[in-house]
A protein has these predicted regions:
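Residue-level detector of the transmembrane beta-barrel scaffold of outer-membrane proteins
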Residues: 43-45, 69-71, 128-130, 185-187, ...
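Short N-terminal edge-element motif at the start of the domain
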Residues: 71, 75, 96-107, 114, ...
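Transmembrane beta-strand segments that form the barrel wall of outer-membrane beta-barrel proteins
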Residues: 38-56, 69-77
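Residues on the lipid-exposed face of transmembrane beta-strands in outer-membrane beta-barrel proteins
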Residues: 58-62, 111-117, 131-135, 170-178, ...
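Outer-membrane beta-barrel channels and translocator barrels
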Residues: 65-67, 77, 120-124, 179-181
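Cleavable N-terminal export/targeting peptides
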Residues: 1-37, 214-232
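Ordered, amphipathic secondary-structure segments that act as subunit-interaction surfaces
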Residues: 121-141
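Extracellular/periplasm-exposed beta-strand and loop segments of Gram-negative cell-envelope proteins
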Residues: 35, 45-49, 79-110, 136-167, ...
Length: 261
């Protein structure tokens, strides 16, 4: 009986030691993993949803506190026709205006500094609010088709115009970020409205007669129907210039995959 009791005590002791060692190892592994994560203060991200808009969008984020981070975003779109041009067309309630600008092309780049506050337990995870500033520069190419009738004479022609428009906006982004694996993260920009101002100009060189100048001058008044921006046009014998100014509004949204290091 004594031998059985001793053997039982020995087995229980070994099991207790084994459990204690396993638990200690697991705690040590978790602690090491947490220390590794705490030491990895950087995230680089690629906004894959932006591809649908013919745009390449990247962001670098760095932790600066338990629930806070700062980031810098960069966006670039090569010059091309406007994405979802049918939607853009529906915003212009005038067929003649659309015919004049349907060959419009644009490219752009933007830089976006941002501050994030995570409302959960730690930085890089959970829901967040992020005030931001965005500077954008749009490169515009506009082959402008125009026509005008004077008595029995109809003037039809085209002038190729190009130039740049710069915008500066501020806004607030609401989003959420999840840890998918040890170093891979998913960042969802849920909604980021922003508002500010725009300014710039486009111009084209072309020798114009008095009739052609008048025809182009009248046709350019159609640009008053463009959404968001105000336009002012100048026409002379050497060509035309259009100045853009006024308010500018935008909306940030996206889905990014990130790597933490």
């Amino acid at each position: 009986m004594k031998k059985i009791f001793t053997k039982t005590m020995f087995i229980c002791g070994m099991m207790a030691l084994s459990f204690s060692a396993s638990n200690s190892f697991a705690q040590e592994a978790n602690a090491n993993q947490e220390q590794e994560s705490a030491a990895a203060k950087n995230l680089v991200k690629w906004n894959v949803a932006a591809i649908a808009l013919k745009t390449y969008s990247f962001q670098y984020e760095r932790a600066v506190g338990k629930r806070m981070s700062v980031s810098l975003g960069f966006r670039m779109m090569p010059k091309s026709h406007v994405p979802f041009s049918s939607t853009f067309k529906s915003l212009i309630d005038d067929d003649q205006t659309w015919e004049s600008i349907k060959d419009f092309k644009t490219g752009n780049f933007a830089i976006t500094p941002e501050f994030r506050y995570y409302v959960g337990q730690s930085v890089f995870r959970g829901f967040y609010v992020a005030p931001f500033v965005r500077y954008s520069r749009y490169n515009v190419a506009l082959p402008y088709n125009y026509e005008a009738t004077f008595g029995t004479t109809t003037v039809k022609d085209r002038i190729d115009m190009d130039g740049n428009i710069s915008t500066l906006t501020t806004g607030l982004l609401l989003g959420a970020q999840w840890k998918l694996s040890k170093a891979i993260y998913l960042d969802w920009w849920i909604l980021g409205p922003n508002y500010g101002s725009a300014s710039g100009s486009i111009s084209g060189k072309k020798n114009l007669s008095n009739e052609e100048q008048q025809a182009l001058r009248e046709a350019l008044t159609d640009l008053d129907d463009l959404p968001l921006v105000k336009t002012k046009s100048t026409v002379d014998a050497n060509g035309a210039k259009i100045d853009f100014s006024g308010p500018w509004a935008g909306l940030r949204s996206g889905l990014s995959f990130g790597y933490r290091f």
